[in-house]
Regions:
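Single-stranded nucleic acid-binding surfaces, predominantly the OB-fold ssDNA-binding core
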Residues: 1-100
Length: 100
């Protein structure tokens, strides 16, 4: 079974804490990146959510920072009020740190 592990390093375009207390980061990645050891390309933008609320509180991330992320990719599906299905590819961060 593929577990969609991913490691990314990129520039933070947006960072905020959502209503549930989780850090959410929009990350621009300009180098090749890998999922389960397979190169999935470069020059991508990812929505990243810190899986653990306590880690969200301890991590100080600002727009423009260089951030390294480890976690896993997941396709989230939900229905809108009108009944249309929406799909979002999200990186759930298990670890992250700001790079110098």
């Amino acid at each position: 079974m593929v577990n969609n592990e991913i490691k990314l390093r990129g520039k933070v375009l947006r960072a905020y804490v959502n209503d549930d207390g989780h850090l959410v980061v929009t990350l621009a990645v300009l180098h090749p990146h890998y999922v389960d050891g397979v190169n999935i390309g470069s020059e991508s933008v990812f929505r990243c959510v810190m899986a653990d609320r306590k880690r969200s509180e301890s991590l100080d991330v600002l727009e423009g920072d260089s951030l390294e992320v480890e976690g896993y990719l997941r396709l989230d599906r939900h229905l809108s009020v009108s009944g249309r299905e929406h799909k979002n590819l999200t990186v759930y961060m298990e670890a992250a740190h700001v790079c110098a």
